[in-house]
Amino acid sequence: MRLSVLLSLLPLALGAPAVEQRSEAAPLIEARGEMVANKYIVKFKEGSALSALDAAMEKISGKPDHVYKNVFSGFAATLDENMVRVLRAHPDVEYIEQDAVVTINAAQTNAPWGLARISSTSPGTSTYYYDESAGQGSCVYVIDTGIEASHPEFEGRAQMVKTYYYSSRDGNGHGTHCAGTVGSRTYGVAKKTQLFGVKVLDDNGSGQYSTIIAGMDFVASDKNNRNCPKGVVASLSLGGGYSSSVNSAAARLQSSGVMVAVAAGNNNADARNYSPASEPSVCTVGASDRYDRRSSFSNYGSVLDIFGPGTSILSTWIGGSTRSISGTSMATPHVAGLAAYLMTLGKTTAASACRYIADTANKGDLSNIPFGTVNLLAYNNYQA
């Protein structure tokens, strides 16, 4: 879809009031990951009136792919070079960023152990100890490939609430697996939480940053319509190259009253170069294995807040089945579920959950931790 702006947006348009011009063009940020051709995210300045965004949209011939009004004001659309130039001159535009590809952070392997580890001070245990409140009254949004809500492990507590594709069905399995680690009956950390699926990735586990932002924008609004008296968590087991707009959206979702847990990434590299992992205000999760080693694939660096079990994690899968896979994608829902569990107990809030989890973590237990990276492993501190 190619968008064009009516001449009334241009200062030289005859008979029309000129749009105030800026002294220099708004920044155009190049994608650091795999670029989506001619696709852009346009972010309006903080404090810009929604009416300014709406007025600009009315002057566009065609419909944007996404309009953002919650995590920030802006839109995503296919634009030609001239349109980008016009929008960069708009006084209310903060920046324009090229859209990029985002993918799941998972890989295949075998066997369950993560639940036992987050309720123990040492590795090698086989029992998960937890308070029977188990996250009841909390809600967790799984922003992913969808959730197979009919899976018996979810006991009717899961539902799909938004999709950006032709179908809301999870045709991949990744989202269902993550949701299972958050809150399924057998494999979940918070076994009584409500699970809401937001499908932002396709059945190949791939998507675009503009759609990820749309999903976060949706959650920032939708949470107000849900009954979640103990708190709201969002789990994002996905990522790509660094993106200012994705980080901004994640930060705003966090500040809106949602605990945001994100995957550090599977590149065995510094997470500061990836998004949303590099956003400082969200909870960035690295992966560990059953022997308390940093998983060989896990990203690291100063932006990490916590590690969670991420190698060979057994959980729910599509078709009413189960599967064991690995990735920081698997570590993230452990922490998201733990946040929901702790919020139900009144131990913390969405605003402080990541810091609380870090403060009460098992400290110094992990090996293969690079310099400058936290050595903290998530722990529920359950006392029988």
Swiss-Prot record:
Positions contributing to Ca(2+) 1 binding: P280, V282, D305
Pfam families: Inhibitor_I9, Peptidase_S8
Propeptide, chain numbering: 16-105
Cofactor binding comment, as recorded: Binds 2 calcium ions per subunit.
Residues covered by the Peptidase S8 domain: 112-384
Catalytic function, reaction form: Hydrolysis of keratin, and of other proteins with subtilisin-like specificity. Hydrolyzes peptide amides
Active site: D144, H174, S329
Domain of life, per lineage: Eukaryota
Name of the protein in question: Proteinase K
Cofactor(s) it depends on: Ca(2+)
